[in-house]
């Protein structure tokens, strides 16, 4: 059995395809995509069929002019297959921002649930050990820490300064040596990236932070220094979670030498700041919040969803008229 024309497939044929996929998976262990490839059915088409309330192309149900289009369902399923580890909420706003499909979270949830494509993502658990201070604007509080990076049979040290309000990486440096002088130099560099700010600086009790060089920079700029609880990394949870993200997205592969490692980390930082959507930021990027633009993004997203809804109404009305 091989389908040549997918533009108009009878309901019984669709049902047969789904039955074949299920039986083949149960009896031989073949994955869905392998069976679909043998049948000549694209995965996006299959999941669009599966997501429909009924298999018939034309139904007798009441006309709903704002009903999601079949091609939008297929696009949502196809997008989810490209990002299998990402939850539906983040997928929703990734698609809206990229102009793939502009619908709300509940619609994406229903489509993916019907297609059995909901990602079972790991829910983050807020740390009970973080300090109660909650910044209300960028650069009121920075968190800093060092992450060990293994490259070419030795360790380097990734020093990062994370803005607590926006999760933006204000400054980073891959250090060759880890000491007070190196850290104080990079703290000074971080302060120079945003002139006139006096953030609270949160760090652990490591000797690279607790020393005369770092203390001198803090005193010169009249900063408030916050030391976390000893042997309690959760107290610095914001930067700890960032470090975990770097490890996860790099797969701990930073290249074969220091210069390659710098390049890998620079790309990761750009992706983290400018592209990666954060649940705690309303599924926006750290750069959006650090630049004070979340309201602009909210308005643009609302505009896109409204425009897509109007377009969906027009298309549905045309199709209903043609089907009459």
Per-region residue spans from a language model:
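Acidic/histidine-rich, metal-coordinating catalytic segments
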Residues: 178, 195-211, 236, 283-287
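RNase H-like polynucleotidyl transferase catalytic core
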Residues: 200-205, 219-238, 252-258
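C-terminal domain-tail junction helix/linker
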Residues: 219-221, 244-324
């Amino acid at each position: 059995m091989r389908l040549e024309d997918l533009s108009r497939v009878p309901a019984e044929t669709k049902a047969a395809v789904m039955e074949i996929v299920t039986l083949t998976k149960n009896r031989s262990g073949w994955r869905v995509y392998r069976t679909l490839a043998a049948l000549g059915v694209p995965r996006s088409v299959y999941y669009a069929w599966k997501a429909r309330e009924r298999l018939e192309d034309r139904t007798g149900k009441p006309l709903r002019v704002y009903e999601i289009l079949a091609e939008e369902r297929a696009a949502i399923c196809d997008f989810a297959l490209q990002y299998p580890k990402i939850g539906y909420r983040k997928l929703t706003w990734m698609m809206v921002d990229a102009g793939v499909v502009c619908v709300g979270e509940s619609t994406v949830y229903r489509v993916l649930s019907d297609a059995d494509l909901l990602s079972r993502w790991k829910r983050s658990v807020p740390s009970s050990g973080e300090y109660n201070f909650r910044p209300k604007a960028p650069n009121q509080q920075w968190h800093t820490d060092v992450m060990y990076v293994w490259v070419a049979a030795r360790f380097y040290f990734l020093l990062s300064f994370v803005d607590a309000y926006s999760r933006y990486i204000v400054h980073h440096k891959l250090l060759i040596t880890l000491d007070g002088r190196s850290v104080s130099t990079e703290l000074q560099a971080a302060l120079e990236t945003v002139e006139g700010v006096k953030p609270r600086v949160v760090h652990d009790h490591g000797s690279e932070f607790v020393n005369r060089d770092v203390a001198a920079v803090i005193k010169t700029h009249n900063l408030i220094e916050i030391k976390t609880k000893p042997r309690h990394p959760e107290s610095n949870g914001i930067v700890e979670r960032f470090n975990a993200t770097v490890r996860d997205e790099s797969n701990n592969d930073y290249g074969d030498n220091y210069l390659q490692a710098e390049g890998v980390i620079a790309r990761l930082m750009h992706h983290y700041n400018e592209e990666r959507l954060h649940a705690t930021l309303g599924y926006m990027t750290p750069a959006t919040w650090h630049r004070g633009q979340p309201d602009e993004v909210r308005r643009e997203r609302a505009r896109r969803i409204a425009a897509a809804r109007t377009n969906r109404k027009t298309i549905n009305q045309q199709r209903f008229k043609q089907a009459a």
